[in-house]
A protein has these predicted regions:
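Cysteine-based protein phosphatase catalytic domain of the PTP/DSP
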Residues: 319-402, 420-454
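Charged phosphate-binding loop/patch that engages nucleotide di/tri-phosphates or the phosphate backbone
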Residues: 446-471
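Short glycine-aspartate micro-motif
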Residues: 1-3, 350, 404
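Short Gly/Pro-enriched loop/turn and capping motifs at secondary-structure junctions
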Residues: 254, 266, 410-413, 423
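Structured, active/binding-site neighborhoods that engage oxygen-rich ligands
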Residues: 1-318
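A phosphate-binding catalytic loop at a beta-strand-loop-alpha-helix junction
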Residues: 400-419
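Short glycine-/acidic-enriched loop or helix-start segments at secondary-structure transitions
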Residues: 15, 360-362, 415-417
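Short, cationic motifs built from Arg/Lys/His that form the positively charged side of catalytic pockets
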Residues: 124-125, 413-414, 441
Length: 471
């Protein structure tokens, strides 16, 4: 869900324009400042603000949470409440949601639009179904995807596209195998009444050799092309970043194609595979039936997904006594704990390694890194999270900023990232970084063996590769 929201916000400024504009604007990754979250577009989105795609996905998630599953009246209530204040609503969805009652609304919209309701709005919001579907059987998850699509889109292709993507998301979360999940979805749907739609209407755009740059196809406002392009973007790349950029660079309905691709790529690469400069600034507002306007930021979207999985919100550890930030390296790198870091000047760069709630919203130069002080699979892409943290420190330093690195207590995660940065900056191995941290930071703790192992092995090899041999 976070992957979909991030991709949606990145694609929004380029919506309904020609292809290639993202890469023309950003020929290289922008690791400093607020990254590539520029905002703008036809609806003047704020930098990092997600669009109707994610707003509707969160409305759908809230409806699933309230009802414990699909309940058409509850979902209709959430959709119509969202629509009452939304500044961008797709044509098909807008027509359908004019009706106070869900029954017959999609068919009426279909007739009003001359039978053209095979649009991508049924799929742009599908990420919560893939997540919630982990708790359901495969058949139940597919049925849920079809039911939510049918509320607003009468054309069966809109339901099939939504169900196909939801099934891929669900399968990828469960197995970690994206390509295997795609093939499994083809095999599963072939045995259902929806199979002929994939085999006929979607066949060309879902083919393994589909190339959106060299084939004629319908606009990507249609469900067929949007799903095909999003699948292509993930299938032909090897990172979340590259998948989303590939989707946006196709032009047209960039936010929606990116949102669909981001949902699948997020399932594949996980929260730690999403560039932190993107996840830090994503935000938006959804009007809800019971709580009015609700502001969502990255952790709020993660919590929504957690609740759909039955996990509840991420636990918040009680705050500790603030520890005054300390300069630990003359390059301008500081260390602190959560509430100590919250007291640094607003022109500091802040690299946060824990849940911060609203403490740093007034700090324009910040990075929120998803990292858990745990062994096992709680950090499935720890190398990437460390690499992103180190790059953020260096980017802020290059801008002439002082940088504070912190976690909740300022102990294990803070030291892990600072040691990784020191190894990279000084071109040394972990034992020297360990000694530096021992001599420099009184709160240093070494209780997470996973952190030690990464610095000793994979990160050490990385430093040797980029420095020509660590000292």
């Amino acid at each position: 869900m976070l992957g979909s929201a991030v991709a949606d916000a990145l694609g929004a400024p380029f919506e309904f324009q020609s292809g290639g504009l993202y890469s023309a604007r950003f020929p290289r990754p922008v690791v400093g400042g607020i990254g590539e979250m520029i905002g703008g577009g036809g609806f003047n989105w704020a930098p990092g603000e997600f669009t109707d795609d994610t707003q509707m996905a969160l409305a759908l998630a809230n409806a699933l949470e309230e009802a414990g599953g699909f309940h058409p009246e509850v979902m209709w209530k959430h959709f119509r409440t969202w629509r009452s204040t939304a500044k961008d609503v797709g044509i098909t969805i807008s027509h359908a949601l004019q009706s106070p009652n869900y029954f017959g609304a999609a068919e009426a919209a279909h007739e009003a639009l001359g039978g053209r309701t095979a649009s991508n709005g049924s799929v742009m919001r599908i990420a919560p179904v893939g997540v919630f579907g982990v708790r359901l059987s495969r058949a139940e998850a597919v049925e849920l995807a079809v039911e939510q699509a049918s509320l607003t889109h009468h054309d069966p292709s809109a339901s099939v596209g939504a169900a196909f993507v939801a099934d891929i998301i669900r399968g990828t979360i469960l197995t970690g195998d994206f390509l295997g999940s795609v093939q499994s979805s083809f095999d599963f749907f072939a045995e259902t009444p929806w199979g002929p739609y994939l085999e006929n209407d979607f066949a060309s755009v879902l083919a393994a050799d589909f190339d959106p740059h060299h084939e004629s196809h319908l606009p990507n406002g249609t469900v067929w092309t949007a799903v095909g392009q999003a699948l292509w973007a993930v299938r032909t790349t090897t990172s979340f970043h590259d998948a989303v950029v590939a989707a946006i660079d196709l032009g047209g309905d960039t936010d929606t194609v990116a949102a669909i691709a981001g949902a699948m790529a997020g399932a594949l690469y996980g929260v730690q595979g999403i560039p932190v400069r993107w996840a830090t600034y994503v935000h938006g507002t959804v009007t809800t039936p019971h709580a009015g306007d609700v502001v969502y930021r990255g952790q709020d979207i993660i919590n929504s997904a957690r609740r759909l999985l039955g996990l509840g919100n991420a636990p918040i550890t009680p705050p500790e006594r603030p520890v005054q930030a300390k300069l630990v390296h003359p390059a301008g790198v500081w260390a602190s704990n959560l509430d100590g870091a919250a007291a640094v000047p607003e022109d500091f760069g802040v690299v946060s390694l824990c849940i911060t709630e609203d403490r740093f919203l007034n700090h324009p130069h910040r990075r929120q890194v998803y990292m858990r002080d745990s062994e096992g699979d709680r950090n499935p892409n720890l190398f990437f999270a460390l690499k992103e943290s180190v790059e953020a420190i260096n980017a802020f330093l290059a801008e002439g900023r002082q940088v504070v690195v912190h976690c909740h207590g300022g102990r294990s995660r803070t030291a892990f990232v600072l040691k990784g940065w020191f190894m990279h900056h000084e071109g040394v191995l972990h034992d020297q970084a360990h000694q530096w941290m021992t001599d420099t930071w009184d709160l240093y703790e070494t209780w997470t063996q996973t952190f030690f192992d990464l610095l000793d092995n994979e990160w050490g090899d990385h430093v040797e590769d980029i420095t020509g041999g660590a000292q």
